[in-house]
């Protein structure tokens, strides 16, 4: 799963530590998410998106991009 957490975090002039405080997690978790080492829970993804003031689908995407979701049945 690709993500743009670092991009939006830097645009908001937030450190990893500050974003972690606002989102309710650790700085290490934000770092691991940014590096793609950890896929956040839905709850954590929503918390991060809220603090960065972006839609969660703009923050996280499947490897093929948004078009890849077209084949998923709900």
Residue ranges and their predicted role:
Residues 10, 21, 50:
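Alpha-helical residues within the helix-turn-helix
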Residues 14-32:
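Short alpha-helical DNA-recognition segment
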Residues 35, 54, 64:
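Short, conserved catalytic or interaction motifs in soluble domains
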Residues 50, 60-74:
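Short, charged recognition helix plus adjacent turn
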